[in-house]
């Protein structure tokens, strides 16, 4: 056995020593009987590592590279593809021949036709040309300069720009390019082209000469046999120009021709001319032709009726510059001789012309102000031209709306309005005749309006029109998805719970099982209105149903003075009855009843909102005299759920007690106005339809039960913001005094609250409820100094201040004012002085009450009381100044006794209870003392208790002799 080392790995080789060796060289090494791979062990140990490695590839640079290993699923997919391809190649299913005798089997009787090619005999397939990308070469040295010059010239040619070439000596040459066929000809600016006469017309610098040689064109490119005006400065190749003057240069710059022996010879602009040639040369500048036409036309057409002798005052060069600016401002073009520019200008309207020229005109005006201050007239011309160009009607949409509104109205004044509207649409391109015609039509419109205004001032209502709007009022609160359920019904949410304050106080329940007979007639102060609630029971017969759906007409007469409202002489249309197109009053018809709904709007635009329902399934109808509660119910729809509690409490506790039954429309509008201050969202709340009964002076707020009585006028007010106009004192209207509901007896509420206050003075539980829920009841204590002092002495006012200090500072401030007032009253002993102190403080407390905005019932009572006291004081002040005595002052003692009646009874009961408790305590304590003390001390203790008893009972005696009938606990015989 032989052991050899391969690297660091030992390998054992077994040798057979008995094997015979041959004579050749092939037997020189020992023959291994059993071959063993020396790397097997190494491969086995490195197998896992090699498995994680990729394939070993041979790179082009002679190195081995290990590739990224492939995932197993890719190796499996490649293996499947190789096997599939190998199977396909080894498959024997190969088509060797085609049997032409076989007839194909027809599976369908339908003729499938045959394939026809559109190729002709001249068809030749076009092979796709390979796209060869040109390699960009890096420009270096002189190539860069040539490339930049070439690109620069290309830009100048395409954009029709002026090329300026300057050498080191700052000698500049100018050139332009003009198109001749497919090539561009270079025109160098010569002296004679700018009105300068020189022997040498141009001197080129070195760079300009090289550019001119590069841009020179042959004479044949001009497509003409002779040169003509406009060819001055053109650079031509000398070898292609006939009859050119002696010149050694390869280029010729056209200046003009000189006759030499009756032969015209072309003169190069760089050649120096003699005096004779200067006088005879015919140059090819187009400016001569321009100035020839300009001068002749100017002289022939200049005005002759001038009031002065013209002189040459302005600089001629500046005149030319200003003329060029005016020309470009009036007619933007590249060349004044270009027909394409003329055509483009004619195809533009005024708006397009203004957009194209406005920026340049502004620049020209600024340039004239800075560099040409003497040419003020040119600036005025441009401003006038600019104003003329920008004349356009910016409100064409409104004109189209006018046309739509008057399309079906051929009579005056709408026919005149149509003509005026047509003229306004054409503003910017009007003739004088059209403007004059529009003025005549406007005169007719003014005459019509003047006659109509005069008729209104004469109370002539023949021209009065107050149509119902054809557009439905959009209530965003009824369109918001968050306010609707899946059936698009309004979701009341918390509003449904708080709406019970309305339903429980101002609505009657209707049990459908008992019928509707007792709810058919709604009582009025001086009549009745028949509701359609009984028609909820419908017959199935069509004829009977149609007969049942007829209303009972009531004659309310035509449009009259009581149907309209005026404010500062003009009609206030929302507060008027509605009319049709011809001025006839719109009258109500039969209104269908519905169940469980709140109806907003009227006629065909009514919206039905499902009312909040309960488990009983009963319906609700407003009580007689309280139909105006439906207005506040409609306003509740626009109140947010968070504020619905405050809204319903304010309506129940403050608004409805003021209104009561059958208030006037002015009071209802005032109440709505107050609510909109605290709840601004209700301004856009939609109202139920309001009908006007002129015979009875009543306004009916329709509910969901409809109306059989028909023929009423219809009020136009549709939303709360329109209804509150009835609350204005400036409104001249009989409608605002019509009854809708109301109770003018405000004093009853004050008396009830006052009795409740007197009852609670010495009852801590009631007084605590007043302080926490209705603190403004304490303000009513100002009616009596005794009541006010009782609250002050019992520390009730102090408790009210402490309770509201961290809840509502304004309420706490009012309670503080009451406490200060009570302390001032306690300092006075005379009743009249106490009343004067109280009355003097009423305006201050009333001003503070106006700053409180809380949904409390007692606010109204306190405000009414304070306003009465303040106004009464102002009235009495005038009487006192005149030397008279008010009867109210003499009756104050009687009023004080009247208020102290219940208050004094409570105090008497308290004294009796106190006496009984005191006597029991004294007797219990004395019985113990008498057992322990001697007779002398007993007598002394007896006298002290007797004196204390007299003081507590209010006696003025400081020492009283004990007797048996004195009432003293000890004035009795000792046992």
From Swiss-Prot:
Q: Name one Pfam family in it.
A: Peptidase_C6
Q: Where is the Peptidase C6 domain?
A: 619-741
Q: Which Gene3D superfamilies match?
A: Helper component proteinase (3.90.70.150)
Give the Peptidase S30 domain ranges.
139-284
**Uppermost EC category:** hydrolase
Recorded GO molecular functions are:
cysteine-type endopeptidase activity; serine-type peptidase activity
Per the record, its GO cellular-component terms are: host cell plasmodesma
Instruction: Show the PROSITE patterns listed in the entry.
Output: HC_PRO_CPD, PV_P1_PRO
Q: What biological processes does GO assign it? A: proteolysis; symbiont-mediated suppression of host innate immune response; transport of virus in host, cell to cell; viral translational frameshifting
Active site located where? 192, 201, 232, 627, 700
Q: What is its EC number?
A: 3.4.21.-, 3.4.22.45
Q: Where is this site: Cleavage?
A: 284-285, 741-742
Which controlled-vocabulary keywords does the entry list? Host cell junction, Host-virus interaction, Hydrolase, Inhibition of host innate immune response by virus, Protease, Serine protease, Suppressor of RNA silencing, Transport, Viral immunoevasion, Viral movement protein
Annotated motif Involved in virions binding and aphid transmission: location in the chain? 593-595
PTM comment: Potyviral RNA is expressed as two polyproteins which undergo post-translational proteolytic processing. Genome polyprotein is processed by NIa-pro, P1 and HC-pro proteinases resulting in the production of at least ten individual proteins. P3N-PIPO is cleaved by P1 and HC-pro proteinases resulting in the production of three individual proteins. The P1 proteinase and the HC-pro cleave only their respective C-termini autocatalytically.
* Similarity remark: Belongs to the potyviridae P3N-PIPO polyprotein family.
The free-text domain note is: The N-terminus of helper component proteinase is involved in interaction with stylets. The central part is involved in interaction with virions and the C-terminus is involved in cell-to cell movement of the virus.
Protein name in the entry: P3N-PIPO polyprotein
- Organism equals Bean yellow mosaic virus
Q: What is the lineage of its organism?
A: Viruses, Riboviria, Orthornavirae, Pisuviricota, Stelpaviricetes
